[in-house]
Design a protein with these regions (language model features):
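Sec-dependent signal peptide cleavage junction
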Residues: 23-47, 51
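Bacterial Sec-dependent N-terminal signal peptides
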Residues: 1-31
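Ligand-binding face of N-terminal immunoglobulin V-set domains in extracellular IgSF glycoproteins
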Residues: 129-155
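Extended low-complexity, serine/threonine- and proline-enriched intrinsically disordered segments
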Residues: 83-112
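Short acidic/polar inter-strand loop motif in beta-rich domains
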Residues: 96-98, 142, 156-163
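Contiguous beta-strand segments within globular domains
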Residues: 43-93
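Short structured motifs
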Residues: 58-62, 116-121, 134-138
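Extended, solvent-exposed segments with strong compositional bias
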Residues: 109-131
Length: 164
């Protein structure tokens, strides 16, 4: 029996946290003290709207993956600030109370827990200028190997000290 089938019934639940984070892979180094004590499904930047986390191709799905599978989730959101920004992300394992787990990254992620949101599309023929962002994750260089709750933390790479 392969790992894919052995873990197929252990769900992984995600919430979106638009918060700042530590991101060593892309030259951004922030203190762990900046992370919230408890992750919440909140938006901290007034320009961010229409946040959706779902299974690709299924608009009303829950943000749940099977541990050990190569399934992905799709994150979409709009930035109404009018400027294209560079966003990064980090994935954290959380306990049942959505507090950051004490486990080291290597025990719950194989590969890199950080990345960059590369897909951005400018609006056209609209009253307001905005950019739509899209991320499919986990990416090729990341595999979630532990079942549990995960927080997807999004931050602005240009100004990582400000909450997005």
């Amino acid at each position: 029996m392969t790992n894919r089938f052995r873990f197929s019934y252990l769900p992984i639940l995600f919430i979106i946290v638009t918060e700042i984070t530590t991101n060593f892979a892309f030259g951004l180094t922030l203190s762990e003290e900046i992370l919230p004590d408890t992750f919440k499904n909140e938006i901290y930047d007034a320009g961010i709207h229409t946040v959706l986390l779902k299974t690709p191709g299924w608009e009303f799905s829950l943000p749940v993956l099977d541990a050990g599978s190569r399934d992905q989730l799709e994150l979409r959101f709009d930035d109404l600030s009018g400027n294209q920004r560079n966003f990064g992300y980090t994935i954290y394992l959380c306990n049942a109370g959505w507090e950051k787990s004490e486990l080291p990254e290597q025990e719950y992620i194989s590969g890199f827990p950080t990345g960059v949101i590369r897909e951005a599309r400018a609006s056209f023929n609209t009253t307001y200028d905005y950019f739509s962002y899209r991320l499919l994750f986990p990416e090729e260089n990341c595999e979630l190997i532990q079942s549990g709750n995960y927080a997807l933390v999004i931050f602005d790479q240009e100004n990582p000290d400000n909450i997005v």
